[in-house]
């Protein structure tokens, strides 16, 4: 059953009754939202002269900053004291975070008139005595430093105002009505104790509960956010409250909301677009040139533009490792406009290089104004320029050893300032339980409703034990107690409709149901949502759906030239093959992507190719150490001419050095039994498939011909090598196809030019005869040559895995015969015949572990 009137409506009648009796009252509510709503009710319904209605914090909040030192200044004073204390070493970032803790502790000691010496002897352990000595020295120095400013701290200033207001209330003999539920803190405790004879409490009733409560458990936090957005969309004509006190979760929820909303939680300024813009500028100023940092700035929504997107595309792939701004202007620009944009950008960002904090902050402001002339006119601009101005004036307190640490410090300071996004016309409001609990809504959404979120345990003080806090008589449990959470929950259940959500997983952890909800289930039957009602309908795509969870798309053509890796892609990921080879879509390596394993593999292949091809001319007569030095020197020369991060070059040099000796020995040993070796040799295999000529191309890393005419095709691998089963089943066909190329003289090697290609491609092996596939007998002259040069030869494929840790070289060899190769060739032909004929490409989630084209299907299946 729902309460007939809301708490505020009942309270409004109570106020009218008091006023009729001639009682002068001052009304204090927990927050400003309740004050505004109560005033609106009194004006609309009763049309009376309003009594004084204020939120509790308005009693002591007087914005006259000349009377007290700012929070930033106080943090810097404490930070300086902490860093000077040599017994416990702190860097600047650590000292600022500790300053926030000590600031609260020291202000509470002053407000409560407590001597810190009370805890001096409670524990005689060496650890505690060190902590106590640290606290006492910092406390005394802090008091002295504050007194020298001839001002109060903000907390003490507000407490003094509160005491003055208490005296005024007593003199006026005015009744104070405290209506609602207030969070416990030292200010409220003092107010209640001093004015207990003047205060009238008006508390809400807990006797009602809605008959429209539903529950759902989405799979993860993103599904929960989608459900919230969908529920809001379905109920856009209603007054909706989303109740949460977690800013991270709120951000996820808001990313999915299409409607306007009011935000009572607020965002710290570092999370706003302007805050992120300033932080990105400071990161660029305080660090060496880095394209990732540059595009972190340029992709900011406030300055992102078409030129940024073009520049990013131009700098993707290998250009993403450019290490200096001067190299940017040496690139080939598609037009003068983009070149001019890039030149202006370099001039703005990289002309000056300040070394002190004042210079960094001043330059940050100048750069921000050049990049966005209207920056301070934005929604948060006024607050941010005030913060920046204050920080510049206090920057003399920042003693920074390394300016690379300053971005973290700036971000931390910025996080202490809140910005609120409130829209009067919005029907959705997001806030904490204490902000929304006494308001009436058409729909309440309680997301992430679990014990961790709704029954948080009080966090232990980082410096003081529970016993020490008891001795000091300081209540640090500022978080809402478990009892208050119960009250809030019961009051929220009085609204018309309540939707309770609890994502099964968040941050990799399983969620558990909240105890409050479990107790509710004992008394009431709570229906579960039908998931179909919570999932937005998806637009059907013009893609053929199949029962085996495949998507199929049709092409009008099939390429005539394929690489051996294209064949593997066609087997493992047909849709990826279609996107790459037919649509011509190639993945670009993004600016922020680190060098990949494949990049390292390409580097090693270049080194080994250059060494191997020049071995007979330059290195054959050298001793082992000189050969090793030559190999390493080749790598250094290649790295010198390659655009890569300095740390990557160093790592690759270390890896190359690690396996160089083992590779030299491996190479020497294999050369002993070889009469011919071919390196990085190009090959091709020509086929006619269903009337279409197909050419398959590939490059063999190394082909060895032994003195006994045995042939081995080697492939160097710096990553994982395929299993024997993958090779046998044709899932990794690279070396198999290279063998087929070899048999058909696709590598143009003279040793295999004795037979005509057309005859070689169709041979079958019998006991004593060789016939072609059309049942024609091979020319006897060719048969003699073939038997001498091919039949007696042993064909082997070998994967050589190269690593920078022992064992440095691992070789996996597989012997092949003509029958096996013929079966693989027949399978290759059948594969190509299917795609050349049908031109139908399916996508299967289980075929490929690495898939750059998955998102192109625009359709996702959930595995059952």
From Swiss-Prot:
Gene3D superfamilies: 3.90.320.10
InterPro entries cross-referenced by the UniProt entry: P-loop_NTPase (IPR027417), PDDEXK-like_dom_sf (IPR011604), PDDEXK_AddAB-type (IPR038726), Restrct_endonuc-II-like (IPR011335)
Domain of life: Bacteria
Protein name as catalogued: Uncharacterized protein RT0391
Protein source organism: Rickettsia typhi (strain ATCC VR-144 / Wilmington)
Organism lineage: Bacteria, Pseudomonadati, Pseudomonadota, Alphaproteobacteria, Rickettsiales
């Amino acid at each position: 059953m729902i309460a007939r009137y809301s708490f505020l409506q009942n309270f409004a009648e109570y106020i009218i009754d008091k006023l009729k009796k001639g009682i002068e009252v001052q009304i204090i509510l927990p927050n400003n939202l309740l004050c505004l709503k109560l005033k609106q009710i009194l004006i609309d319904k009763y049309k009376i002269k309003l009594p004084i209605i204020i939120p509790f914090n308005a009693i002591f909040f007087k914005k006259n900053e000349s009377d007290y030192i700012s929070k930033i200044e106080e943090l810097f004073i404490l930070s300086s004291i902490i860093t000077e204390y040599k017994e416990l070493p702190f860097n600047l970032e650590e000292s600022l975070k500790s300053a926030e803790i000590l600031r609260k502790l020291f202000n509470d000691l002053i407000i409560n008139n407590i001597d810190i010496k009370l805890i001096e002897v409670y524990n005689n352990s060496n650890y505690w005595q060190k902590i106590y000595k640290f606290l006492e020295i910092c406390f005394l120095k802090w008091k002295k430093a504050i007194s020298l400013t001839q001002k109060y701290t903000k907390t003490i200033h507000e407490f003094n105002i509160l005491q003055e207001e208490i005296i005024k209330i007593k003199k006026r003999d005015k009744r104070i009505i405290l209506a609602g539920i207030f969070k416990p803190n030292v200010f409220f405790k003092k107010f209640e104790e001093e004015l207990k004879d003047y205060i009238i409490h008006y508390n809400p009733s807990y006797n009602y509960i809605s008959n429209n409560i539903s529950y759902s458990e989405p799979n993860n936090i993103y599904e929960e956010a989608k459900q919230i957005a969908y529920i809001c969309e379905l109920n856009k004509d209603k007054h909706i409250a989303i109740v949460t006190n977690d800013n991270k979760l709120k951000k996820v929820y808001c990313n999915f909301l299409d409607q306007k909303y009011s935000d009572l939680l607020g965002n710290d300024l570092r999370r706003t677009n302007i805050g992120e813009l300033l932080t990105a500028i400071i990161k660029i100023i305080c660090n060496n040139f880095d394209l990732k940092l540059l595009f972190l700035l340029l992709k900011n929504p406030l300055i992102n533009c078409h030129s940024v997107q073009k520049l990013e595309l131009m700098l993707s792939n290998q250009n993403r490792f450019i290490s200096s701004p001067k190299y940017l202007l040496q690139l080939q620009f598609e037009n003068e406009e983009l070149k001019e944009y890039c030149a202006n950008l370099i001039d703005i960002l990289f002309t000056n290089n300040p070394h002190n904090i004042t210079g960094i902050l001043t330059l940050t402001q100048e750069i921000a104004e050049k990049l966005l002339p209207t920056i301070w006119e934005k929604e948060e601009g006024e607050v941010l320029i005030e913060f920046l101005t204050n920080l510049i004036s206090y920057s003399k307190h920042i003693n920074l050893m390394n300016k690379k640490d300053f971005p973290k410090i700036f971000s931390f300071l910025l996080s202490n300032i809140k910005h609120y996004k409130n829209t009067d016309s919005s029907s959705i409001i997001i806030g904490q339980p204490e902000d929304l609990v006494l308001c009436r809504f058409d729909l309440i959404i309680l997301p992430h409703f679990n014990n961790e979120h709704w029954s948080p345990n009080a966090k232990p003080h980082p410096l003081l034990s529970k016993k020490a806090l008891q001795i000091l008589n300081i209540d640090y449990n500022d978080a809402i107690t478990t009892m208050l959470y119960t009250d809030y929950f019961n009051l929220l259940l009085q609204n018309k409709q309540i939707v309770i959500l609890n994502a099964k997983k968040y941050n990799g952890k399983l969620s558990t149901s909240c105890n409050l909800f479990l107790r509710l289930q004992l008394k009431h039957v709570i229906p579960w949502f039908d998931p179909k009602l919570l999932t937005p309908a998806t637009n059907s795509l013009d893609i053929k759906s199949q029962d085996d969870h495949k998507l199929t798309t049709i092409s009008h053509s099939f390429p005539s030239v394929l690489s051996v890796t294209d064949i593997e892609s066609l087997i493992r990921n047909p849709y990826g093959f279609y996107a790459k080879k037919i649509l011509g879509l190639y993945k670009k390596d993004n600016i922020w992507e680190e060098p990949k394993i494949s990049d390292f593999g390409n580097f090693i292949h270049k080194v080994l190719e250059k060494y191997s091809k020049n071995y007979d001319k330059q290195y054959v007569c050298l001793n082992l150490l000189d050969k090793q030095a030559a190999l390493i020197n080749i790598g250094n020369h290649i790295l010198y001419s390659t655009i890569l991060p300095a740390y990557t070059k160093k790592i690759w040099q270390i890896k190359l050095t690690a396996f160089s000796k083992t590779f030299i020995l491996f190479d020497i040993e294999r050369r002993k039994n070889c009469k011919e070796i071919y390196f990085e040799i190009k090959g091709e295999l020509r086929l006619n498939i269903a009337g279409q000529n197909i050419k398959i191309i590939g490059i063999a890393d190394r082909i060895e011909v032994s003195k006994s005419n045995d042939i081995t095709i080697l492939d160097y691998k710096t990553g994982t090598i395929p299993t024997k089963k993958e090779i046998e089943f044709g899932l990794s066909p690279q070396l198999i196809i290279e063998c087929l190329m070899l048999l058909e003289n696709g590598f143009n090697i003279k040793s295999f030019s004795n037979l005509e290609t057309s005859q070689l491609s169709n041979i079958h092996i019998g006991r004593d005869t060789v016939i072609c596939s059309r049942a024609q007998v091979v020319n006897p002259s060719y048969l003699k040559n073939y038997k001498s040069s091919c039949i007696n030869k042993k064909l082997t494929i070998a994967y050589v895995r190269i690593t920078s840790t022992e064992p440095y070289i691992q070789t996996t060899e597989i012997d092949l015969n003509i029958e096996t190769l013929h079966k693989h060739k027949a399978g290759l032909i059948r594969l190509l015949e299917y795609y050349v004929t049908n031109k139908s490409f399916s996508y299967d989630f289980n075929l490929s572990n690495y898939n750059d084209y998955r998102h192109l299907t625009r359709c996702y299946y959930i595995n059952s």
